[in-house]
Amino acid sequence: MTYKEYRDKVLNFIEEHEKWRSHTINLIASENITSPSVNRAVASGFMHKYAEGWPKQRYYQGCKYVDEVELIGVELFTKLFKSDYADLRPISGTNANQAVFFGLGQPGDKVIVLHTSHGGHISHMPFGAAGMRGLEVHTWPFDFESFNIDVDKAEKMIRELEPKIVMFGGSLFPFPHPVKELAPVAKEVGAFVVYDAAHVLGLIAGGEFQDPLREGADIMTASTHKTFPGPQGGVILYKKFADDETIAKLQWAIFPGVVSNHHLHHMAGKVITAAEMLEYGEAYAKQIVKNAKALAEALAEEGFKVIGEDQGYTKSHQVIVDVSDLHPAGGGWAAPLLEEAGIILNKNLLPWDPLEKVNEPSGLRIGVQEMTRVGMMEDEMREIAHFIKRVLIDKEDPKKVRKDVYYFRLEYQKVYYSFDYGLPMKE
């Protein structure tokens, strides 16, 4: 094969992927779809540019237009999240967490985070960014019944350990975390309160879920491509939470600590997404939560064991389903079958699963944010629940269901809650 043929093959795979993706029901909770305007930014000449440092204080020349875009971004993000500072330079949510761990922690300092099985992100773990910084990682006590941090036991843990950082947020995140209840206790022992908003940033922007910076968090870290429907990237939002020297340590941890050039085409895409969310974020976040509740209720009616029934199943974009009663391999069996039917989601550990079950966990994690953005509403969620039932409970041939999924998805090809297409119209 010639090198040009390799090129052609790659371009063909990209084209095939885009065609395939546009005809699937994508329920991956950590993905979304960007608007045409954001796509223009990401594909722009900003991808060729390098910039280090702050706007107007660069180490490279030729940043005149890049600086203006980034300054607009700081203005829009601080307005959207009512923060004192917004730093768009992290290139991922994990990268944002790295900056916090390196800026505010020293090797041997204690941090309290959510355990992976309970929904914590890998970057919070001893084998992730927290451990790589040399932090001593402790995990929140968890209440299986409420599917959340156990507040009483957590208060006791904070007072006993006197950690440097307490961290809320995670990857399995159907219900708000008790920031309001635990932040005052953390402040008593001098801990920084950090909230990883990667999954719920768009819901926070739209006034749904919870408002961490008003509830006591000092800092929010996040990725920008889940419920916040931008390009892949990260952001750090924070209040004037400490003296100037401490804040400077965080800023220096970002650059030159863990970021050099900050992928300016993605930065520009984040800025446009912030403008979209200021215009449409409230409607978008509201519909996401409505859709998640509708899907959860429909799945329960179809015979699935949906987690969190006593609390209304979910208050976020996520629906968590325990499928271990359908097959010994649980989510490891269900997710590939659903992919054959054109329904894309991921297997997931549930709080009672040991880490050894990572490939055959009990659960499925479902997110509705992308299908909401292409215009789907509660009625469509009920149809999706029935597609899932046909595959997993009725044991129908996934290829047969795939045909129905294909035609169902054909109607939903526009990216709403954007300046390109506005709001979806309910017929």
UniProtKB/Swiss-Prot annotation:
Gene3D superfamilies cross-referenced by the UniProt entry: Aspartate Aminotransferase, domain 1 (3.90.1150.10), Type I PLP-dependent aspartate aminotransferase-like (Major domain) (3.40.640.10)
Cofactor: pyridoxal 5'-phosphate
E.C. no: 2.1.2.-
Compartment(s) of residence: Cytoplasm
Keyword Kinase assigned: no
Modified residues (N6-(pyridoxal phosphate)lysine): K226
GO MF term set: glycine hydroxymethyltransferase activity; pyridoxal phosphate binding
Listed PANTHER family: SERINE HYDROXYMETHYLTRANSFERASE (PTHR11680), SERINE HYDROXYMETHYLTRANSFERASE 1 (PTHR11680:SF35)
Similarity remark: Belongs to the SHMT family.
Function: Catalyzes the reversible interconversion of serine and glycine with a modified folate serving as the one-carbon carrier. Also exhibits a pteridine-independent aldolase activity toward beta-hydroxyamino acids, producing glycine and aldehydes, via a retro-aldol mechanism.
Protein name per Swiss-Prot or TrEMBL: Serine hydroxymethyltransferase
Native organism: Pyrococcus furiosus (strain ATCC 43587 / DSM 3638 / JCM 8422 / Vc1)
Lineage summary: Archaea, Methanobacteriati, Methanobacteriota, Thermococci, Thermococcales
Gene giving rise to this polypeptide: glyA
